[in-house]
Amino acid sequence: DPDCQVVVTTGCTEAIAAALLGLVDPGDEVVVLEPYYDSYTAMIQMAGGVRRPVTLRAPGIGDEHSRLDVDELRAAVTPRTRFVLLNSPHNPTGTVLTPGELQAVADVALEHDLVVITDEVYEHLVFDGSEHVPIATLPGMFERTLTLSSVGKSYSFTGWKVGWATGPADLVGAVLAAKQWLTFTSGSPL
């Protein structure tokens, strides 16, 4: 429903800021895969959240990309953890999480009642036979996933700051509540 499940933002960075400011309460933990886009740390801190990093592991023999260690992901979750901030395809490594890795993230989110905030700005920039699968499409995940993206990377309009957040109405509503006080409204090309 475009009236309550979509909000347009001034680029994906604003979507990230509004999502974290709108959803994270002081002391909430946010699991984030590192290395990561530099605004993640600043926005988690601005929201009063606590960053719980999980380091992607360097490529092994026969693998071109870094990999998620599922045991480390599970170990990062504590009773204060409320969110997983996901980025796949990943900036800066280029890693595209495998279906098995995505399912592991989904399993952890479902098991611990976590919300997944997924930054998918590189969803159309996938190479070497990899396939981007939105985590929101996995069973049980739409209800707990906020998907963020923009036209900047996918359509080579990096200066045209048009982004969005999509997901269930309660999550999008929280983004909208914070976004209203960041830029009030986003520009339009017309």
Tell where the protein language model's regions lie, with residue ranges:
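Phosphate-binding glycine-rich loop
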Residues: D1-E29
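Generic structural signal for small/hydrophobic residues in well-ordered secondary structure
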Residues: V6, V30-V31, I44, V84, ...
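Aromatic/hydrophobic pocket-lining residues that form π-stacking "cages" and hydrophobic walls in ligand
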Residues: A18, D38-Y40, V105
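Short hydrophobic alpha-helical segments of the AMP-binding
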Residues: L23, V30, M43-I44, A109
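A short helix->loop->beta-strand "cap" motif at the edges of active sites that frequently abuts
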Residues: D28, G49, E111-V115, M141-E143
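A short helix-loop-beta submotif of the ANL/AMP-binding
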Residues: M46-R52
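Active-site phosphate-binding strand-loop segment of PLP-dependent enzymes
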Residues: R52, L56-D128
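Conserved core segment of the aminotransferase class I/II
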Residues: L138, F142-L190
